[in-house]
From Swiss-Prot:
The keyword Cell cycle applies. Cell division factor that enhances FtsZ-ring assembly. Directly interacts with FtsZ and promotes bundling of FtsZ protofilaments, with a reduction in FtsZ GTPase activity. The lineage of its organism: Bacteria, Pseudomonadati, Pseudomonadota, Gammaproteobacteria, Alteromonadales. It comes from Shewanella baltica (strain OS223). One of its GO terms (cellular component) is cytoplasm. Gene3D superfamilies: YacF-like, YacF-like domains. SUPFAM superfamilies: YacF-like (SSF160950). This is Cell division protein ZapD. Interacts with FtsZ. It is found in: Cytoplasm. Pfam families: ZapD.
Length: 244
């Protein structure tokens, strides 16, 4: 069996970042494979999230905070200076497009094809060709043309998604996995340092999955048997990383 990774954000900022990262991965998958009309679901979810919340200021503050921390690490002897330089350059480049005032994806609202689809996609079974003949026409286009269209649509969100990817990479890099045991299916941890993310890696052969709850200084992990859908009373070996 394979090892599965479960992540639990411990603050709203990381929760939002993970949702955006999840949609970004779906976008990239749709860019590489022809998933027909399913490619529009993550695109429209991203449109809705961007309209609901302007992440720009939060991301800019996070970039500045990490740049300051990375600059301090550069002065240390035992660190990978080349890797730090790569992150500093990447964050600096990612910061520039965020200075523009337009909301991410706002130009897609002017796209009549995209707007017509968004109005219908929330309705059950509303992708029939008599409801959306323009979609039926677009789906019949050669894959290369659809890929080009899709690439142009998701490009509107790259100024947001690129720094999100970098910031989550930096967050995950703050901790390594350590061996842990959930006795009777339960594990509790605490930290004097404010945590942002709990990561659990567990072998699927255990037949269970973790439910994680907590806040920045304390968290709890309950393992649930999938088949019975109840709390496991067995001791579960797993790997744990607590990221600040």
């Amino acid at each position: 069996m394979t090892e599965l990774v479960y992540e639990q954000p411990l603050n709203e900022k990381i929760r939002s970042y993970l949702r955006l990262e999840y949609l970004d991965k779906q976008l990239q998958s749709n860019l590489n494979h022809d998933h027909q009309h399913r490619c529009f679901y993550p695109l429209f979810s991203l449109c809705e999230l961007s309209e609901r919340c302007d992440y720009r200021n939060e991301v800019l503050k996070d970039i500045e905070r990490h740049l300051l921390q990375l600059s301090k690490w550069q002065e240390l002897d035992h660190v990978d200076h080349q890797q730090i330089d790569l992150y500093i350059n990447a964050l600096t480049q990612a910061r520039e497009p965020l200075q523009k005032p337009d909301r991410f994806g706002s130009q897609l609202k002017q796209d009549r094809f995209i707007s017509a689809l968004r109005q219908r996609f929330g309705m059950p079974g509303a992708c029939c060709n008599f409801d959306l003949p323009q979609l039926h026409y677009w789906l019949a286009k050669p894959w290369e043309e659809k890929q080009q269209d899709y690439r142009s649509w998701i490009a509107h969100f790259e100024p947001l998604l690129t720094p999100i990817t970098l910031l989550l990479q930096l967050t995950r890099s703050t901790a390594h996995y350590d061996n842990a045991v959930a006795h009777a299916g339960f594990y509790q941890g605490d930290s004097a340092q404010a945590l942002a993310l709990v990561r659990v890696k567990v072998d699927a052969s255990h037949g269970c999955y973790p439910t994680i709850s907590g806040h920045k200084n304390r968290f709890a992990i309950h393992f649930v048997q999938f088949e019975q859908q109840r709390h496991s009373d067995r001791s579960i070996d797993f790997l744990l990383a607590t990221c600040a």
